[in-house]
């Protein structure tokens, strides 16, 4: 089955708008198991139960709360959540560009492919080629299913990839961990030991070929499952409808020049106000 886009919209940088489609770059390969009652093989159903009364709680009586100070809660209303939620928009807005070498891979979270839609090829190619030539990455904001993410935009093979980024605040500080210090003398490591370790690394050095590696656990489980399957079931998953997108032809040269002029004005204004 051909892949379907998550949404159709646009990617913007400066005043340039490029109509694109966003596709998941990673397929679902995780094995999901259902829980059954071994006595009659019926599905196990979870209920929303009140801890004190043991009674099931209807959805209209459930509220969301943030726990603080061990057992104390602040009720968060749905209208408050809606106000905090970002405006739903089918666009990727590049806010700045950074040298690609400065973006540490630990920030990468989830990849998506960007594909140009009709009349968007020229702007798409301009963005792809300028990212290659300048060896830069676009830092952008993107909203997916009502949640805003930080993302990196960079060329990948023949196309452009968007990789969601983790925020710096998500990382634990290494100070919290009992890690060895940078002073190797403290651990009495000899030059010979380092040399032998280096030889081992060089002996194991090879080219990175991702297609060589497979999820062996999944393969074993699926082989075992398929051996037991006598009948199969199919599941239909509803996909989000694609939003209409403008495909008007634009003058990219003029937009690029005007974007540069706008940035220069902003910089002059900032330096003059100091």
UniProtKB/Swiss-Prot annotation:
**A Pfam family it matches:** Ku
Q: Say if the entry is tagged with keyword DNA-binding.
A: yes
Gene3D superfamilies tied to this protein? 2.40.290.10
Name a single GO biological process. Answer: DNA recombination
Q: InterPro entries from the entry? A: Ku70/Ku80_beta-barrel_dom, Prok_Ku, SPOC-like_C_dom_sf
Which is an annotated GO molecular function term of this record? double-stranded DNA binding
Q: Which UniProt keywords apply?
A: DNA damage, DNA recombination, DNA repair, DNA-binding
Query: Quaternary structure per UniProt?
Result: Homodimer. Interacts with LigD.
Which purpose does this protein serve, as stated in its record? Answer: With LigD forms a non-homologous end joining (NHEJ) DNA repair enzyme, which repairs dsDNA breaks with reduced fidelity. Binds linear dsDNA with 5'- and 3'- overhangs but not closed circular dsDNA nor ssDNA. Recruits and stimulates the ligase activity of LigD.
PANTHER family cross-referenced by the UniProt entry = NON-HOMOLOGOUS END JOINING PROTEIN KU
Name this polypeptide is given: Non-homologous end joining protein Ku
Classification lineage: Bacteria, Pseudomonadati, Pseudomonadota, Gammaproteobacteria, Legionellales
